[in-house]
């Protein structure tokens, strides 16, 4: 076992990966987030939501959402992304909070409906889909449940090397062609200094620890 804050040195984040509330309209025929919440509240325990596994980002995002809004849904964990999204397409579950790049082809083909993205800002490739935080619903203010990827170095790495690596990463991420490539997949560039990234890691650990506790999440 290891501790990400004591055994590694944060170098730089790379991208924020947004999840999006994705529904099968043949199972739950609603057109916006308010209708979704009203339907779930009117039928506690009726609807199942899929995730890519216990404790996965898709699970954590929905767990936080349900806890904030007081929703009673049944969690159905699958062993990975393909099984989870397939369950929604088949109507075995009503919905999932999955990565934009995963659901995008199904959205474009009309098989699923997208109700809200989990990031604080809209996602470039699906700008027509509002953020959950902007819905105005009680409990959604400030909602930001994104996944990020970043680069770390081993504990004890020379700070000068960490700073140089971080600067190199930021310069690459700021290239227009790199930004465009990530945005086309539903992701957003994240620019932070090593010190800022260190704070992000610490704050997110505290946040998700509380979500795990409140939602009584266990890991397989």
Residue ranges and their predicted role:
Residues 1-83, 132-137, 142, 148-181, ...:
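Hinge/capping helix and adjacent helix->loop/strand transition within the periplasmic-binding protein
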Residues 9, 36, 111-123:
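Conserved helix-loop-beta element of the AMP-binding
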Residues 32, 77, 92, 99, ...:
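Conserved functional loop/turn residues at catalytic and ligand-binding sites
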Residues 43-47, 71, 89-98, 111-114, ...:
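Alpha-to-beta junction loops
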Residues 53-54, 76-86, 90, 99-102, ...:
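Short helix-initiation/N-cap motifs at beta->coil->alpha
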Residues 61, 81, 98-103, 117-120, ...:
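Beta->alpha turn/N-cap motifs
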Residues 62, 88-89, 107-110:
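Hydrophobic residues within well-ordered alpha-helices
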Residues 193-219:
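Extracellular/periplasmic bilobal clamshell ligand-binding domains
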């Amino acid at each position: 076992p290891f501790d990400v804050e004591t055994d590694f040195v944060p170098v730089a984040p790379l991208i924020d990966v947004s999840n999006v509330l994705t529904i099968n309209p043949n199972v739950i025929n609603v057109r916006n987030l308010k209708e979704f919440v009203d339907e779930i509240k009117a039928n506690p325990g009726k609807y199942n939501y899929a995730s890519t596994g216990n404790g996965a980002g898709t699970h954590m995002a929905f767990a936080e959402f349900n806890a904030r809004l007081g929703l009673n849904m049944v969690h159905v964990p699958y062993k990975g992304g393909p099984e989870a999204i397939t369950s929604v397409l088949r109507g075995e579950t009503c919905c999932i909070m999955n990565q934009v790049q995963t659901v995008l082809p199904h959205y474009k083909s009309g098989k699923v409906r997208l109700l809200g993205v989990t990031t604080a800002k809209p996602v470039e490739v699906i700008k027509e889909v509002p953020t959950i935080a902007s819905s105005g619903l009680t409990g959604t203010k400030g909602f930001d449940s994104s996944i990020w990827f970043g680069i770390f170095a081993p504990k004890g790495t020379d700070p000068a090397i960490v700073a140089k690596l971080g600067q190199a990463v930021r310069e690459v991420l700021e290239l227009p062609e790199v930004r465009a490539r990530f945005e086309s997949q539903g992701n957003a560039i994240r620019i932070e200094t090593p010190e800022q990234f260190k704070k992000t890691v610490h704050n997110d650990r505290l946040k998700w620890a509380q979500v795990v506790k409140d939602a009584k999440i266990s890991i397989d």
